[in-house]
Amino acid sequence: METLANRLDVCQDKILELYEKDSDKLEDQIMHWQLMRLEQALLYKARECGLTHIGHQVVPPLSVTKAKARSAIEVHVSLQQLQHSAHAQDPWTLRDTSREMWDTVPKKCWKKRGLTVEVRYDGDENKAMCYVQWREIIVQNYTDDNWVKVAGLVSHEGLYYMHEGQKTFYVKFKDDARVYGDTGTWDVHVGGKVIHHDSFDPVSSTREIPAPGPLYACTTQAPTQAQVGASEGPEQKRQRLETVYGEQQQQQQQQQQQQQHTQTPAPQTTERARQPLDTDRTRDRDTTCPHPIGHRSDPDCVPVIHLRGDPNCLKCFRYRLNKGKNKLYSRTSSTWRWSCESENQCAYVTIWYTSYGQREAFLSTVKVPPGIQVILGHMSMFT
C-alpha cells in the first residue's frame, strides 16, 4: 500500500509541475494527459484493494475513477494522433487541450481563436444570446483519420464549417429562436457587422393565434374566419379584418334603420335614448361587438381586448406580457369580474392599445394560451 501511495504522490507532483510550467508545446500536453490516465488507474486500484483514503486524499468510487480514466484515454489518444499531423508544431496550451474544449461544440475536435457572436432574437437587446465562432477548427478526416484545419464561418442560419465538401452546422439559431424569441426572427451581430433577417416564412413561425373561444360575439362566422387567419400574413390579416368590420358595420346600420322605421318615439324620448350612447358605461358593455371602425372618429375612444378565462391563468399570462411584451400595448388592467355574476368563476383582464395597428400587431405576435377567450372592443380613454 505504501508503494501505491508513493507512486500516486509522484504522479500528482509531475502534474503540478506541468501546471506551473504552463507550456504551449503539444508534447507537454500529451504528457499531462498520460499522467491523468495514470492517476485514475492508481486510484482505481486503491479502491479495488479496499482503500477509501490515501493519506488525506479521498479515494473515489470505482465508477467515478473508471469514467475519468476513459475520458483521459480519449483525449490522450486524440492528442497522440494530432502529433503526427501538420499542426503538431502549433502552440497548444492546457486550455486548448482541456476536456472542456474537447466537449465544446463542435464536439470531438479542437478549436482555437474564438470570436463572440451576439444574436438578438426579435431584434431586442434584452433577448440577446452570445455564441462562440471558432475561426480555427481542427477536425479529423473521414477517410485517412488525418487532422486538418478548417475555418469556422457564420451566417444568418447559424455557425458552421466546411469539411470535405460538406457544410456542418454546430449551432442553429432557429432552434434557440423558439426558446428565446417570439416572432421567429433574429439579427446576428459579429465583428461590427449585422446580418439581418432577410427572409421570414410565416408558415414556419412558432407563434400562432389560437381561437379557443369566439373572437367576435356579434356574428357566428367570425370564429371560423379568425381560425383561418391564424396562418395568414399580417397584411392579409389586416385586410381581412377590415372587410369583416365593414360588413358588420353595414349589417348594424341596416338593423338600426329598420328599428327607426318600426318605432316612432316622441322627440324627447328619442333624445333621452341617444344620450347614453356617449357614456363610458355603454362603451364598456359594447366591447363584445367588434365594430371599432365606426368609432375611429371619436378621439376619446381607444381599441381594447378583453381576456376572459380562469383568474390564475389570466394573472400568469398578464405577468408574462409585462415581462416581455410591454411594447405591444399601452396598459393592462387588474383581474376583474362582473358583480352580477357571482356564480361564474371566469374573470377578465382588459388590455389597452394606442392604435388599431398596435392591437393587430399584438394579436399577430402574441400567442394566447388555450382556455383564454379574446374579445375585441373599444373603450373611452381615461387616466
Swiss-Prot record:
Post-translational modification comment from the UniProt entry: Phosphorylated.
Origin: domain of life: Viruses
Region of interest called Transactivation domain, as start-end residue ranges on this chain: 1-206
GO CC term (a single one): host cell nucleus
Low complexity bias: start-end ranges: 248-260
Basic and acidic residues bias spans: 271-288
Quaternary structure and partners: Binds DNA as homodimer. Interacts with protein E1; this interaction greatly increases E1 DNA-binding activity. Interacts with protein L1; this interaction enhances E2-dependent replication and transcription activation. Interacts with protein L2; this interaction inhibits E2 transcriptional activity but not DNA replication function E2. Interacts with protein E7; this interaction inhibits E7 oncogenic activity. Interacts with host TAF1; this interaction modulates E2-dependent transcriptional regulation. Interacts with host BRD4; this interaction mediates E2 transcriptional activation function.
Similarity comment: Belongs to the papillomaviridae E2 protein family.
Protein name: Regulatory protein E2
Native source species: Human papillomavirus 3
Gene that encodes it: E2
